[in-house]
Amino acid sequence: NLNGKITFNINSLKGIKFFDGAKIDLKVINGKLILSNSTLTSYKIGKMFFTDSVLESVDNKKIFKSKILFKISNQKKFYQKLLISRPYRIKLNNVYFEIEKDLNNNEVEIKKIILNKKIVDNSSNKSIDLSNLIDVNEIKELKNWIELKKYSNQIFFKISKLN
């Protein structure tokens, strides 16, 4: 078995519209790849933190599991990037999600999505669990950046009707 740790500091990500840089903290422990403490950074919008992130082999399948917290530092830029109309915008500090991806067949399972997840108890923003509001099959059908923006607009429209 191979064990070790390597860190990649990436200052420029080409071909990725949302993020500018990354820090990939890769650990190998008993054949399991652990990506916890890795980050993706958008200098204008915020930072995505990967916790409990692992790539493992289960029943001859390569499975990536991750808990991800996207802390939003500039809501205006976030909403502009996704083209969310002003009436559908909410005060948004972060987006938390848990995913599992089968790398053999490209299937993604979204276990949980929460807007404004309480990290500390003093946050005054209402936490919104979107896990039952989002259809994973619709997400799988998204083929490009434009479709993602349209889908995001639909989700924020639904959220605005809930509040």
Model region roles, listed by residue range:
Residues 1-162:
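Small-residue helix/turn framework positions
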